[in-house]
Amino acid sequence: DLPVDVRFMLPSCVPATPMDESGANLDYRAIDSFYDHPRVQGLAEMMNSYGVIHSDPDVVSKIVASQAHHKKIDGHAPDLVGNDLNAYVAAGVYSDHECHDLNDAIAKLQRGQFIMIREGTAARNLEALAPLLCDKYVERCMFCTDDKHPSDLLEKGHIDYIVKKAISLGVAPITAIKAACHNAARYFLLNNRGAIAPGYL
């Protein structure tokens, strides 16, 4: 019976590639006015890493627009390494949920990215990335599901399921809860969320 406070990230890649057919072509002009909505937190997973690295005009326009509104830009950069990863992060993409192993995640953490540890229906990375939930890295880690089927949500749960699984893997309960609530709220600048304390919702 608690109120649900839904927040949104604007789509960064519709269509996902120039070869795809979709119901629309959302360039920066199509999404720019939505940044003023109070529930919009930023630009969703920037899948076109090639466009970021090579300064594709449409991609750069979307990044610049998000930054002009002081919004977050979430990443989607599997297997991006070295100078390509440096360029991607330097463009302002400060998170990633596509880490499959510790080396990938640590390389991104070392470059200043936040890691969204994913445990969804198809992609499940919690077991591989649970060692990040330690004093050295936990402040820059949070949980996400990415894609999760409705039946899994009903049967297993959402972020609460990831918390339980993290604890079963040996993560300290307070650390798991912090990654689920506090860290995500801090990342998205939701300053009165993510804690059970006076003044928090």
Predicted regions and their residues:
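Divalent-metal coordination cores built from histidine and acidic residues
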Residues: 1-70, 136
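Hydrophobic faces of well-ordered beta-strands that scaffold small-molecule active sites
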Residues: 6-10, 41-45, 73-75, 95-97, ...
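Divalent metal-binding pocket/active-site signature
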Residues: 45-102, 107, 119-123
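Phosphate/diphosphate-binding loops
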Residues: 6-8, 121, 190
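Short acidic, glycine/serine/threonine-rich loops at helix termini
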Residues: 17-23, 54-58, 84-88, 107-110, ...
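His/Asp/Glu-enriched, well-ordered alpha-helical/loop segment
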Residues: 132-201
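Structural recognition of alpha->loop->beta junctions
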Residues: 28-42, 88-107, 138-142, 171-172
